A protein has these predicted regions:
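His/Asp/Glu-enriched, well-ordered alpha-helical/loop segment
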Residues: 132-161, 213-214, 240-241, 247-328
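C-terminal cap of metal-dependent C-N hydrolases
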Residues: 256-260, 316-382
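Metal-associated gating/positioning segment near the N- to mid-region
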Residues: 1-44, 61
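Divalent metal-coordination and catalytic microenvironments
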Residues: 10, 49, 78, 112, ...
């Protein structure tokens, strides 16, 4: 995974504020992890930033510490995984506890919805059968298991009275569960990401080991799922488009799984080109309007995560965070020209229209005419307001 320093350099090329995932795995105290994340950012970021707190199974100590950390640090969002048993997967009991704590504080629980236990069994079955190709990453993580986990998370959140944010939704099965819950009045929000809207499962079946470049979780789905995602965005049943940035170089990283698909590091480089991809494939093709585009990548997220109205709008009293976007620029995406610290691009060779050309943070240029003019260390840590988060988001 890219370091915080490297991420801030190329995040600032397209973005005014980031919320980074603070990893707590392996730490006895949540506060220790948060301190480490502050140290990573100190003096290095040219844009404003905050944290999502990522938790695994809660110990009695971390369970007691969680409310205090969220309040002290102004963190309004906790992420929990229902997959990755060996690393991050939480039990349903921990997930429910997180929902209860979040409900009492007015925080949001972000959930990676896949049935990790069943996926692990399917992976072992494929390995025993001698399958090692990247395509089996997708075949062992079927959409039905994303849909099942999404429904389970929705019901647990509802019982706890909490607000749920389903991250990186990929498929019709999960979309249908979110729509059904929202129609019943549940506080559920959904996010998808550029690759799920524009790439499909066939990318993992490329000759040789090229498919490893497209291994992330949840996996890419068959192409027909894309229409369901676009339609859900248009209908505001999915509210945001996130980056899900987590890149690994092909050489030396992705290649670790050349003889075993389950050892390919999960993640891809999406952050830099996401605006151009979404504008070209969404706005330019008439799937969403320019105003909907802005809402999905900025305003709705600011409301859900307690940044609004400081961020996510241009208004008196708000931060003058502005991205100037030229809709007429045409360019070809390539790893040879991108700014990300990774040796490939999943959109290599794509011709796109539209590009951010200047970025202002609190009224000061960070990028001007595509050149970095910001000051490292000028980015500020943004504390967000608990209690107001869910209320601000209710009209989304």
């Amino acid at each position: 995974m890219a370091t915080f320093f490297k991420k801030c350099i190329y995040f600032s090329y397209r973005t005014t504020t980031i919320l980074d995932f603070c990893l707590t795995a392996g730490e006895d105290k949540l506060s220790t992890a948060v301190e480490k994340w502050h140290d990573k950012a100190k003096g290095k970021s040219a844009i404003d930033y905050g944290f999502h707190l990522m938790i695994g199974d809660l110990t009695p100590e971390t369970e007691a510490e969680l409310p205090q950390i969220l309040e002290q640090e102004g963190i309004t969002s906790v992420k929990v995984f229902m997959a990755y048993a060996k690393e991050f997967q939480a039990t349903d009991r921990t997930l429910f506890k997180a929902f209860k704590i979040a409900k009492d504080l007015g925080a949001v629980v972000m959930v990676h919805c896949e049935n990790g236990s069943v996926i692990d069994e399917l992976v072992e079955e494929a390995r025993r059968a001698g399958h090692k190709e990247p395509i089996y990453h997708a075949l062992t993580r079927p959409a039905e298991l994303e849909g099942e986990a999404t429904k389970r998370a929705i019901e647990l959140a509802h019982i706890a009275g909490a607000t749920l944010y389903v991250v990186h939704v990929t498929c019709k099965e999960a979309v249908d569960e979110i729509i059904a819950a929202r129609e019943k009045g549940y506080n559920v929000y959904g996010e998808t990401c550029p690759p799920y809207l524009t790439l499909d499962q066939s990318a993992l079946a490329q000759p040789g080991f090229e498919g490893a470049k497209y291994v992330w979780s949840p996996p890419l789905r068959p192409k027909y799922h894309q229409d369901h995602l676009w339609n859900a965005l248009k209908a505001k049943q999915l509210q945001t488009i996130g980056s899900d940035q987590c890149s690994f170089s092909f050489k030396g990283k992705k290649q670790l799984g050349i003889n075993d698909f389950s050892k390919i590091p999960n993640g891809g480089p999406f952050i830099e080109d996401r605006f151009s991809i979404l504008y070209s494939e969404g706005v330019a093709k008439g799937k969403i309007s320019i105003n909907e585009f802005v809402d999905m990548i900025s305003t709705s997220a600011a409301k859900i995560f307690g940044l609004f109205p400081q961020k996510g709008t241009i208004a008196i009293g708000s931060d003058a965070d502005i991205v100037i976007f030229d809709p007429d620029v045409k360019r070809e995406i390539s790893a040879k020209t991108h700014h990300m610290n990774v040796d490939y691009n999943p959109y290599e060779g794509w011709e796109v229209t539209g590009e951010p050309v200047s970025v202002l943070v609190r009224g000061e240029y960070v990028i001007k005419n595509k050149e970095f003019v910001g000051v490292l260390g000028s980015g500020q840590y943004i504390k967000r307001a608990l209690k107001t988060t869910a209320a601000e988001a209710l009209n989304i």
